[in-house]
């Protein structure tokens, strides 16, 4: 019988109604009591490192999860993390970069409704996660939700209330789960290196979302205070005329800053070579592109890069474009 470590962190799945709204209050042991069918499937040990609404999750919490998995890695066959849905995609992406080459599954799940309600998706999601974690072919960081298995770097929350809350962006679902049966769409990739854990992140990253007519007034402060700036642009990517000149001047003033372009559009990614607003600035400002990476993956990968990689731009560029847990297939 396989041994699975259950890591409860709060979220809607573990919430109860209070006069101020839903609040995480259900313990890890209580969560497990709602899915007795997994008792004969595996031997489960539960831990509860923190208990948060996922809107309050910060990078330090990701480091805590890495430490928990690292501490228990040799003692368990897999890991199931119960997490809130609002920042689940960020956590899954972050753990994909912080725990690499894991031959053991690290499954993240949650729910749109608390597990103690009569009508809820929580029981199925949690049960599916344990079945997936116990399967011999499972590995790496994945999200299991609404019967779908999504690579940790490809998930995006696309619905606020419906059970099918997450989509896999520009990449197939890895598998589907129905009635405890797993149908795999893609074979898992063999890892050539042993598992590696990274506990350091830098949160000195700013996401600049462009709007029509955006003012450049805050750009100097952003460039001064942040080590990396992710520009969430329109369409395939570019710098609009309203901020083009000051943006270029600041890039020249702060050549050590890491500038990355991503797109506000969910599907099909960026390509700054298409339009004049992108082509020239990409070269002049030495901008990296997200291509088909999600904003969640770009943000957390940048945090990981700043926390663990050399300061020179060439090394960071090479690491940024290296595929990790299916985060990019751009050629």
Question: What is the role of each PLM region?
Answer:
Residues 241-331:
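ATP/nucleoside-binding phosphotransfer catalytic cores, i.e., glycine-rich phosphate-binding loops
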Residues 1-70, 267:
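ATP/NTP phosphate-donor binding region
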Residues 82-104, 241-249, 277:
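Short Gly/Thr/Asp-enriched flexible loops that form oxyanion-binding sites at enzyme active sites
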Residues 2, 7-11, 28-38, 151-236, ...:
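Accessory alpha-helical/coil subdomains and C-terminal extensions
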Residues 15-16, 87-92, 122-126, 239-240:
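Short glycine/serine/threonine-rich phosphate/pyrophosphate-binding segments
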């Amino acid at each position: 019988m396989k041994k699975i470590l259950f890591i409860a962190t709060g979220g809607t799945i573990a919430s109860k109604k209070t006069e101020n709204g839903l609040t995480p209050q259900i313990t890890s042991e209580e969560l497990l009591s709602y899915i007795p069918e997994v008792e004969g499937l595996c031997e489960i040990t539960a831990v509860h490192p923190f208990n948060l609404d996922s809107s309050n999750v910060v990078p330090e919490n990701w480091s805590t999860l890495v430490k928990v998995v690292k501490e228990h890695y040799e003692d368990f066959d897999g890991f199931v993390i119960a997490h809130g849905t609002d920042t689940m995609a960020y956590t899954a992406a972050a753990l994909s970069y912080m725990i690499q080459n894991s031959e053991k599954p690290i499954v993240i799940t949650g729910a749109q409704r608390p597990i103690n309600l009569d009508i809820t998706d929580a029981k199925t999601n949690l049960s599916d996660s344990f079945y997936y974690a116990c399967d011999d072919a499972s590995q790496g960081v994945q999200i299991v939700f609404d019967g779908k298995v999504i690579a940790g770097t490809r998930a995006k929350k696309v619905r606020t209330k419906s059970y099918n809350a997450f989509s896999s962006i520009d990449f197939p679902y890895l598998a589907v789960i129905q009635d405890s049966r797993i149908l795999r769409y893609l074979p898992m990739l063999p890892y050539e290196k042993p598992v590696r854990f990274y506990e350091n992140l830098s949160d000195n990253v700013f996401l600049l979302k462009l709007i029509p007519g955006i003012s450049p007034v805050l750009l100097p402060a952003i460039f001064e205070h942040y080590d990396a700036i992710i520009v969430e642009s329109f369409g395939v990517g570019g710098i609009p005329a309203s901020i083009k000149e000051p943006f270029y001047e600041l890039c020249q003033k702060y050549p050590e800053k890491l500038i990355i372009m991503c797109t506000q559009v969910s599907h099909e990614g960026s390509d700054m070579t298409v339009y004049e607003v992108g082509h020239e600035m990409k070269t002049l400002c030495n901008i990296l592109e997200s291509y088909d990476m999600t904003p969640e993956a770009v943000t957390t990968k940048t945090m990981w890069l700043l926390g663990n990689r050399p300061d020179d731009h060439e090394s960071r560029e090479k690491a940024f474009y290296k595929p990790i847990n299916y985060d990019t297939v751009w050629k």
